[in-house]
Amino acid sequence: MTHAYTKVRQALCYGSATLGAAALAALIAAGSAAAAESHGVATAKAAAADLAAGKADDPVVLKAAPINARRVFVYDPKHFAAISQFYMIDGDTARVVGTADGGFLSNPVVASDGSFFGQASTVYERIARGKRTDYVELLDPQTNNPIADIELPNSPRFLVGTYPWMTALTPNNKTLLFYQFSPQPAVGVVDLAGKKFDRMIEVPDCYHIFPSSNDTFFMHCRDGSLLKVGIGADGKSQTKRTEIFHKENEYLINHPAYSPKSGRLVWPTYTGKIFQIDLSSQDAKFLPAIEAFTDAEKKEGWAPGGWQQVAYHRESDRIFLLGDQRAASKHKAPSRFLFVIDAKTGKRINKIELKHEIDSVGVSQDAKPQLYALSTGDKALYIFDPETGKEVSSVNQLGAGPQVVMTSDM
């Protein structure tokens, strides 16, 4: 059984290709010519000319280009609706190249080699009631067609506002890990290569999942330590706690930035203290913490804020942190500024005025990256040049409440 409906958006809204209905042709012919034609209008006129010439008028579903570092995935949970939606965006052209439906509070994943994107999700027999089914679905990134549909036994998913690192892929993209909260904390293991559920690994009261290798991941525990978990080929897992790296009153945000490829975990607190951990050696190496804001700025109310508040770019070793002046309890409110920080020295490189209320930030992992600033209120993705701080393009009409932005860790 397939749990998602897939589709590719066509020409009028986003300028992809095929149109071809007689009514549309008549409408275009009757309309007044614009001084500067949009791509969609030009495509529609070409389709009308083809129709008049007697060419075939059958609809054609196009394939998207293969994923590159600038393919952006935006997830809209639709304010806790039973059916949610994904938007796939070409960052170079600022166009939606496809959409896919999800279930209730899906957790999106994107393969680091661009071979698929997918979700761990939940649906109900009668849309929002009835028998619950949890599943993992993988989709072809060019057609959006399902390539794997794996049902999870006993409805194990933790249904909470979409936290990207509650579900994760191992570096080889062959295993998906997801978090279970009840009846006891555990991490589910899904064999993507074999297209089957594997097992649950019981863990102590720890959260988030950061794979450091194909058989090892780390979690954050309530006492301020990390838990190292070895999956174990024999079905037996091994666990070991690290040192405690933050104090009880140093509250970490819910959405850290993590690069499985480099093993760098970047985790700010509510006040802008940034902890960095190197997980690349299979052990946790705690780097010196840095401060995003000066003491004077903190007194003025400057602090991180948003849903996904931080992003990390591997090659430049830079941190991008959303921030604004806010009350202490407003750490989930959007921000109007982005702070660019050298991850090695802690030095502030730039302060970008975004001129929009931004909830989530992402960055492409190419040599000259793009910054992606997602506004839930505007239902729009704004694309920036991180060097100049200038907005270069935008994509609007992204659902009801888009909240999560993801790129491939290529």
UniProtKB/Swiss-Prot annotation:
One of its GO terms (biological process) is methylamine metabolic process. Its EC number is 1.4.9.1. It catalyses: 2 oxidized [amicyanin] + methylamine + H2O = 2 reduced [amicyanin] + formaldehyde + NH4(+) + 2 H(+). One of its GO terms (cellular component) is periplasmic space. Transmembrane segments: none annotated. Its main location: periplasm. Residues 1-35 form the signal peptide. It is found in: Periplasm. Tetramer of two light and two heavy chains. This is Methylamine dehydrogenase heavy chain. It comes from Methylorubrum extorquens (strain ATCC 14718 / DSM 1338 / JCM 2805 / NCIMB 9133 / AM1) (Methylobacterium extorquens). The lineage of its organism: Bacteria, Pseudomonadati, Pseudomonadota, Alphaproteobacteria, Hyphomicrobiales. The gene is mauB.
